[in-house]
């Protein structure tokens, strides 16, 4: 297992995935984001982030949601409902430019 230079808890399982930042050759650089896993299919997970924006015209706050596709390595195995930390990497496919780095908690147990 290699050190990726980011302060996250490394996975306990091993994997043979080339696109794993811990066991493969994928480098992580750029943004680090946190969100909830909404859907998992194959090696891809859909991460939903909830953003709160201030609207000056109405002097109120508005909730917005954004969805990102992230690579889900076999050693991490994030499931729907998990709160995860994702990191930006090179484009893995047409829509995936992020990889899941760690599972922080579950939907009912936010940390």
Swiss-Prot record:
InterPro entries: NA-bd_OB-fold, Ribosomal_uS17, Ribosomal_uS17_arc/euk, Ribosomal_uS17_archaeal, Ribosomal_uS17_CS
HAMAP family found in the cross-reference section: Ribosomal_uS17_A
Organism: Archaeoglobus fulgidus (strain ATCC 49558 / DSM 4304 / JCM 9628 / NBRC 100126 / VC-16)
Subunit-structure text: Part of the 30S ribosomal subunit.
Protein name: Small ribosomal subunit protein uS17
GO terms, molecular function: rRNA binding; structural constituent of ribosome
UniProt keyword Oxidoreductase present: no
Lineage, broadest ranks: Archaea, Methanobacteriati, Methanobacteriota, Archaeoglobi, Archaeoglobales
PANTHER family, A to Z: 40S RIBOSOMAL PROTEIN S11 FAMILY MEMBER (PTHR10744), 40S RIBOSOMAL PROTEIN S11-RELATED (PTHR10744:SF9)
Database matches in CDD domains: Ribosomal_uS17 (cd00364)
Highest taxon of source: Archaea
Family per similarity comment: Belongs to the universal ribosomal protein uS17 family.
Keywords, ordered alphabetically: Ribonucleoprotein, Ribosomal protein, RNA-binding, rRNA-binding
Role: One of the primary rRNA binding proteins, it binds specifically to the 5'-end of 16S ribosomal RNA.
Record GO biological process: translation
The keyword RNA-binding appears for this protein: yes
Gene Ontology CC annotations of this record: cytosolic small ribosomal subunit
Pfam families per UniProt: Ribosomal_S17
